[in-house]
Amino acid sequence: MARVTVEDCLPMVDNRFALVLLATKRTRQLMAGARPLQAASKNKPPVLALREIATGKVRFDRSVRDALSGKFDKEKVNIPAGQTRTLR
C-alpha cells in the first residue's frame, strides 16, 4: 500500500497540530478495541488512524479554533518577567 503522509491528511484538518491531536485520539481508540472504519489491513493503529483521516472517515465535530478559543480565554497565567514556569 502507498504511504500515508501528513500532506494527505491536511486538507481534512485545520492545521498540523490539530492533525496530531486527532490522529493520537483515534490511535488510542483503535488500540483500546474500537472497530476500524476502513477494511482490515495489517497496518498498525497510527497508520490506520491517518488513513481514516485522509479519507475523511474521521474528523473533528467542530473547528479546532472554536474548541480551543473558550478554553484559553478562561485561563490566564501571570508570570513575572525573567521567570519561567512549567504548566501542568
UniProtKB/Swiss-Prot annotation:
<dbReference type="GO" id="GO:0006351">
    <property type="term" value="P:DNA-templated transcription"/>
</dbReference>
<keyword id="KW-0548">Nucleotidyltransferase</keyword>
<comment type="function">
    <text>Promotes RNA polymerase assembly. Latches the N- and C-terminal regions of the beta' subunit thereby facilitating its interaction with the beta and alpha subunits.</text>
</comment>
<dbReference type="Pfam" id="PF01192">
    <property type="entry name" value="RNA_pol_Rpb6"/>
</dbReference>
<protein>
    <recommendedName>
        <fullName>DNA-directed RNA polymerase subunit omega</fullName>
        <ecNumber>2.7.7.6</ecNumber>
    </recommendedName>
</protein>
<dbReference type="GO" id="GO:0003677">
    <property type="term" value="F:DNA binding"/>
</dbReference>
<comment type="similarity">
    <text>Belongs to the RNA polymerase subunit omega family.</text>
</comment>
<keyword id="KW-0240">DNA-directed RNA polymerase</keyword>
<dbReference type="GO" id="GO:0003899">
    <property type="term" value="F:DNA-directed RNA polymerase activity"/>
</dbReference>
<dbReference type="InterPro" id="IPR036161">
    <property type="entry name" value="RPB6/omega-like_sf"/>
</dbReference>
<dbReference type="InterPro" id="IPR003716">
    <property type="entry name" value="DNA-dir_RNA_pol_omega"/>
</dbReference>
<keyword id="KW-0804">Transcription</keyword>
<dbReference type="GO" id="GO:0000428">
    <property type="term" value="C:DNA-directed RNA polymerase complex"/>
</dbReference>
<comment type="subunit">
    <text>The RNAP catalytic core consists of 2 alpha, 1 beta, 1 beta' and 1 omega subunit. When a sigma factor is associated with the core the holoenzyme is formed, which can initiate transcription.</text>
</comment>
<keyword id="KW-0808">Transferase</keyword>
<dbReference type="InterPro" id="IPR006110">
    <property type="entry name" value="Pol_omega/Rpo6/RPB6"/>
</dbReference>
